[in-house]
């Protein structure tokens, strides 16, 4: 109460911050006449003037007022749009590295140009991040007119570009692109072997559009570049046949936690099935040797019990394609990891693709935290303000709307069953359609959108494609005649290519649009329809200028007439029935776009995004949610109590309960889910930070190595450290000479580097110490390497050293990632032993990293000591074996040796191999037993150094 009173007297922190910008807004407005008087050339010249002032010592903050005034004038001259005062405030928030929360239709795209231009003056590059390729191309072309007018270059990063095109785009002053493309380019850059092949040029400043969608909704989804492992499709198909043979009592499903576990009875049944199929080793499913089998069984269970077709994924062209739960879009090319995607493929009887090994990965949380300055824009961020500040140190600033919001948000209607709910939605859609009010029905999944579509079809409605001119002509003709055409369109992941057109036309009189979650759609719904879309469809093909101008005038008049129809499509509802002579009391509901929500989402933000599609820029509109006790959120969070209450109230079939209390109860349930999801994301980030710290060390190390003309000093240091570790292993510190394992040391040296060094003779010398052994070994190793340099030349050896070092580092890093993944899966069990899983993970991950570093020194030393290089002009008995690293974008061989070829592998008969002389082994298959007699596979023994 006291807090509310204080806010009334002094305003909220947000109000005070917004008020603090007014001085600079006034200064920008005061400059407007002066800037407007400049010629185009003089206005363009201001960019060079600003850059000169920066070079002379001024800061970007010093230039904010004149730079913003310049952009505002350039926008007026190129786009015919002038930044409102509130948009100037939004630009200041972005420049300060925070989140500008701006309602739908307030011009976020235009706002970004202010901060983008100002920060691009520094010449370090500015990245504007969008959620899809369409928006990246649209915004770069649209806003690029402003930047181009002011003498700045604009690039765009979309799927399908080669490295040269990407380099050119990143070299521009301003680069537009999707979050996925930026992240994958970063990962690919850190798999390159030459600095000149890298495409990004640092992470200076990024503005993220739909920041909540990217940094919250997708925060738990890592970007992964992977390579195929051995084919195990038969095993997945075998395991999949067992799951339908289980009863529901054989496993427990926790929908809140998204987990499924076998009961005792289920475990016994699975063990019997596995044993009969010859897939179980030992007696128990949980024996150590069955760890992989347990993993596959768990993933198959999850695929059947937790994942639903047409909700979590769709099946198309013999593929399982993931559906983004927040946007309803197909995530083409994305695959679930850890074998889950293969389990889904087996479940749906499509081709099971090989499992992949992670080659490189990063989460959006860690990628975007690399930027020196990060900012974001969205229509809905305040509900997640704590998370934005906690994880990204971004404050959310609510920007006032240019005009007051005139949308009416009504209380939810709650029904007993989904069938009753759908019937009520259908009735509401019919009422709105009769008065020509456009309706947008939001659904939580593709499945639900298609259920609603079937309801409409059964009641005489016809589905059309809003991108089809014939279908739209019918809708326009009906709108002109003022008669409902009973036509509807469906927007979901199946038709995502057309989503911008479908959304843009959702404001036409009588239009009915069914859409999955509207998060991140990025396209305004204008009352009466979209002028740009109609010109593109109806006038773009007209070549005659006069004819084209006439057509555009006709379209404009059409849209104005349609807008007027929509604004007048008010609804009069009875709020009190007639009593005696007293007439019924009625109330008017506004026209405009009518938003109908068919289900509450787990996140209030997604619901707010749906509501926010209506009421743009002061337009009237209304929104209402229709719910049932069978909806996921209601079912999982307390529908039993509500059901009992509705029964006591005597609620009949088809009747709904409408009360603000219901809305508050649902909001509390949503807050609980949001808090739980935040905790999950926060906890996952703590674990991912461990891997991220190691990733930064490896990636920074790679870049430093690529910068060096020669890594000779680095490999020499590695060689010497390896020798120190080797001697310490066989010659314990402060031990007597009699306790030294000289034979072991000699054998290890011979095994790893192939040199017969008289270590045993040295050890017999009087008074020799371990330091002397180290010195002598270093001298022998160094002389051996010097001989190779003398034989093949310094340039050739320097190239070989760098190639081998980078390749080996990459190989071991990939193996390390697999180890970290496995560790992360099981580390939670340490909690049962009263130990903190996070601290245990940090400790174990550090030990693994140290181990990897040790293996790197050993492997690089071994390979360089053994490498034989053959100049191309020397005759060869066998075809050469070359080292290749194919770039995934261009297909270029990044590891092509310009004038050098590694020596061919010789094939030797197994009978002629001497276990103690690796030089007699020739080529050994990776899965053969190692010729040394260890009993291990070659790839796990000497093959590690091959």
UniProtKB/Swiss-Prot annotation:
It comes from the Bacteria. GO terms for cellular component: cell envelope Sec protein transport complex; cytosol; plasma membrane. Keywords: ATP-binding, Cell inner membrane, Cell membrane, Cytoplasm, Membrane, Metal-binding, Nucleotide-binding, Protein transport, Translocase, Translocation, Transport, Zinc. GO terms for biological process: intracellular protein transmembrane transport; protein import; protein targeting; protein transport by the Sec complex. It is a peripheral membrane protein. May bind 1 zinc ion per subunit. Monomer and homodimer. Part of the essential Sec protein translocation apparatus which comprises SecA, SecYEG and auxiliary proteins SecDF-YajC and YidC. NCBIfam families: PRK12904.1, secA. This is Protein translocase subunit SecA. It comes from Rhodopseudomonas palustris (strain TIE-1). The gene is secA.
